[in-house]
């Protein structure tokens, strides 16, 4: 063996040792020396690429994998590694092509099938992802990660019971697999098995103190109407991640249910600040303003109530301007407008009331257009058309009056029909 080969072998050994110790910058130095000594060494390019990938230098890693493949176009690991780098850059279709090639060259590598499944999963091609996870498990029946990933794909297809079986297997193979406990908790939550879900979230938190597990445990407690406990979990989620917009939103919901409206509004405003394009917070603040208006109406504080109702409308308008395809916010705005219309009717401002009721109808029709099973919107339409018939009885023809009454009854019947399905 000549001096050059001895030096190459030494740099390879040092590079492997550095890689094992996760000293990736040193890895790059060692394999760069190999490449300087032998620029046709495909393994050196591949290994340097791996180090760069671990440093999240994905584009540079791809350049090294390209070179490795150029030197050896049957280098299955280089295709696989390049696929991983492209996956991390969210170039999923390109990643799949590399995984395809890696599998063509070596179809016995369970990890490649798993990772190709991950790319298909992220493209929402869940059925295809499951096929890849199936193959990964066929090749390695103890592959806990593949069971977990297959469970996630089934969960996205709303196959919750099947997903749980996969999570069970993942946990059987690795009883410290925090993600599998967390994911199983989510499936049990979706099956409304809230107490069981909490047990899984407890285990996930014990193993990995994650903000998501606290947030989702809070959701389960919320649905059990244990609002104070839910708030404690949301507090912890926010402590771990103070930019967790959904945790603020969920905490706001719990506080709203405890009638702690000012605190709830503060949380909803924070969720809006963090996610300005998410309209859920706008809808909830509008709803709270409407609830507060109802309280003021009972106290006969009409001006204050009207002010709150108009503030609510402003929030709904902001939300709709951001996202115009959400049925709930149209329904909410219609409900609040109905309150204002009733206010005008009770003051005998009939023309104003009629104009407002017609705006309400537009909102409820839009809510139904976006969700044709929106029972509350149908019920509200019936309520308004019945009012319009009554307050206009002396101004419209008998035919128009009867038509409004008929439409009102049809809307009530439709609402009842939909509610009976629940």
Predicted regions and their residues:
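TPR-adjacent "capping" and linker segments in tetratricopeptide-repeat scaffold/adaptor proteins
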Residues: 1-11
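Conserved alpha-helical positions within TPR/SEL1-like repeat arrays
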Residues: 12-20, 43-54, 77-88, 111-122, ...
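Short coil turns that delineate tetratricopeptide repeat
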Residues: 39, 73, 107, 141, ...
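Canonical positions in the second alpha-helix
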Residues: 34, 68, 102, 136, ...
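TPR/TPR-like (Sel1-like) alpha-helical repeat modules
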Residues: 386, 400-422
């Amino acid at each position: 063996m000549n001096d050059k080969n001895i030096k190459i072998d030494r740099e390879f050994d040092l590079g492997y040792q550095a890689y094992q110790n996760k000293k990736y910058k040193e890895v790059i130095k060692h394999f760069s020396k190999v490449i300087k000594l032998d620029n046709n060494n495909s393994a050196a390019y591949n290994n340097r690429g791996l180090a760069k990938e671990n440093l999240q230098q994905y584009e540079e890693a791809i350049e090294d994998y390209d070179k490795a493949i150029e030197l050896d176009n049957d280098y299955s690991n280089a295709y696989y590694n390049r696929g991983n780098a492209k996956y991390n850059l969210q170039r999923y279709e390109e990643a799949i092509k590399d995984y395809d090639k890696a599998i063509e060259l070596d179809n016995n590598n369970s990890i490649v099938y798993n990772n190709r499944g991950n790319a298909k999963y992220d493209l929402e091609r869940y059925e295809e992802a499951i096929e890849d996870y199936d193959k990964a498990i066929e090749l390695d029946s103890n592959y806990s990660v593949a069971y977990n990933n297959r469970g996630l794909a089934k969960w996205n297809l709303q196959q919750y019971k099947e997903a749980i079986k996969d999570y069970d297997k993942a946990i059987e193979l690795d009883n410290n697999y925090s993600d599998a406990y967390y994911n199983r908790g989510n499936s049990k939550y979706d099956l409304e098995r809230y107490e069981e879900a909490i047990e899984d979230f407890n285990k996930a938190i014990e193993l990995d103190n994650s903000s998501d597990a606290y947030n989702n445990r809070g959701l389960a407690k919320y649905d059990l109407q244990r609002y104070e406990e839910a708030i404690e979990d949301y507090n912890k989620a926010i402590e771990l991640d103070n930019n967790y917009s959904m945790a603020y939103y969920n905490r706001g919901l719990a506080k709203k249910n405890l009638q702690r409206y000012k605190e709830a509004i503060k949380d909803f405003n924070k969720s809006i600040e963090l996610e300005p394009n998410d309209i859920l917070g706008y809808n909830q603040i509008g709803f709270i303003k409407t609830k507060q208006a109802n309280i003021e109406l009972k106290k006969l504080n009409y001006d204050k109530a009207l002010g709150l109702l108009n503030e609510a409308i402003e929030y709904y308008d902001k939300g709709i301007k951001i996202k115009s395809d959400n049925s709930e916010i149209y329904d909410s705005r219609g409900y609040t407008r109905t309150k204002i219309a009733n206010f005008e009717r009770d003051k005998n401002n009939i023309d104003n009331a009629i104009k407002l009721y017609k705006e309400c109808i537009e909102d409820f029709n839009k809510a139904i257009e976006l969700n044709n099973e929106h029972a509350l919107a149908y019920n509200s339409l019936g309520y308004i058309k019945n009012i319009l018939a009554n307050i206009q009885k002396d101004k419209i023809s008998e035919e128009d009056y009867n038509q409004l009454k008929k439409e009102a009854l049809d809307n009530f019947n439709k609402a009842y029909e939909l509610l009976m399905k629940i």
